[in-house]
Amino acid sequence: TPVITMDLFSTIIDAAGVKAKDETIDGVSLWPVIKGEKESERPIFWHYPHYHNGGARPYSAVRLGDWKLIKQYESDTCELYNLKEDIGERKNLRDDCPQKADELSRVLEKWLKTVDAQLPSENPTWDAKRERKTGKYAGLD
């Protein structure tokens, strides 16, 4: 069962028998999964709309079951991986499984709208020549 850190608090308070208002806590309790009562089959989302000196570029992703879709904002492309068969994400299956990619794209887009996610936008102070010369993004150091 895939988990994400925001599930930890919900799981701990559930295990402790504490009731909390649903609207105040992100994440889902995994206590029923830990007790063997059920499997979790829900999407897990990542959203990183920023650039980082370490080389990270804006992307969003969703994992549902064995499948993971990554949307790259710079190139406006998607990558699709079957994590059961390819945990290292080496073989992009976007062209081989277009229906699965479209399905996960719809799930991701719906979630981005639901949470009113900030989408990346162009940085008017970005200097491509400086980045190539220094390896750093203009305006971030």
Give residue ranges: language-model regions.
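C-terminal cap/loop subdomain of S1 sulfatases and analogous C-terminal strand-loop tails that border
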Residues: 1, 6-83, 114, 133-134
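Long, internal low-complexity/basic segments
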Residues: 8, 54, 64, 69, ...
